[in-house]
A protein has these predicted regions:
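Bacterial Sec-dependent N-terminal signal peptides
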Residues: 1-22
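Extracellular/lumen-exposed scaffold segments
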Residues: 20-148
Length: 148
């Protein structure tokens, strides 16, 4: 019975610890001239954890990636920019140069709305967080941002 209680306690402790290691996401759209919007998708990892850049090479950790859903009223312009404190180093485990964000990462995408109408842009972001000892499995977050 003591062993069963111990196993239950360990599952509970690790389950709670893992549940707390999630990225907090926030989304906003800033109106620009000529029906353009600057989309901000901000990732805030838990203290002591970091999120990887979109520019992580093959063979490295899972890069942050964005997939925008099709919307006939919205044109996604060029590539998404990244803002934040970037740390670059050679990762001995992956044997590649990696980039991650220390603290918040602001991913910025410019879009154009066809016409002067209200619509939205939706999609999903896949990311992975790590600390100096371990990584969490990649996770996917859906988003929907109003453009009005």
């Amino acid at each position: 019975m003591k062993q069963l209680a111990f196993v239950f306690m360990m599952v509970l402790v690790f389950g709670v610890a893992n549940a707390q290691q999630k990225i907090s996401w926030s989304y906003s759209a800033k109106k620009l001239p000529n029906n353009k919007y600057e989309i901000h998708i901000v990732a805030t990892p838990p203290p002591g954890w970091h999120i990887y850049s979109q520019l992580t090479p093959d063979g490295g950790p899972v890069p942050t990636t964005f997939k925008f859903s099709k919307n006939a009223l919205v044109v996604v312009q060029s590539k998404m920019n990244e803002k934040g404190k970037v740390v670059s180093y050679f990762d001995k485990n992956f044997k590649v140069d990696v980039k991650y964000f220390e603290g918040k990462a602001d991913f910025v995408q410019v879009v154009t709305v066809k016409g002067n109408i209200k619509t939205n842009i939706s999609g999903e972001v896949e990311s992975m967080i790590c600390n100096d000892r371990t990584c969490m499995p990649p996770s996917t977050e859906k988003f929907n941002i109003a453009l009005n």
